[in-house]
Amino acid sequence: MNIENAQKQVDDWIKNHGVRYFNELTNMAQLTEEVGEVARIIARRYGEQSEKESDKNKDLGEELADVLFVVLCLANQTDIDLQDAFEKKLEIKTKRDHDRHHNNKKLK
């Protein structure tokens, strides 16, 4: 699946199951909530915080998919072709950061 197809799948899902998109501000709040859930898992599973018993069954992939779903919703409702935007951003980052990380002593 590419990003364009993912955007279409989300749009179809919203039309068939979600009635309509939440407004952009609501979706931004939803995105913040979902990113917080990802952060909680990472902080407790891979960071220094102790993992609570109730967090041990949390699925990081599922939470990342929640983040992606809301990002795709925001792109759809603001008429952004995320496939195109991502490709442009990757090109910018490649030109800008071509040697940057290779010369970073902290990464060696």
Regions found by a protein language model. Name each.
Residues M1-L64, L68-K108:
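Flexible "arm" and connector segments at domain edges
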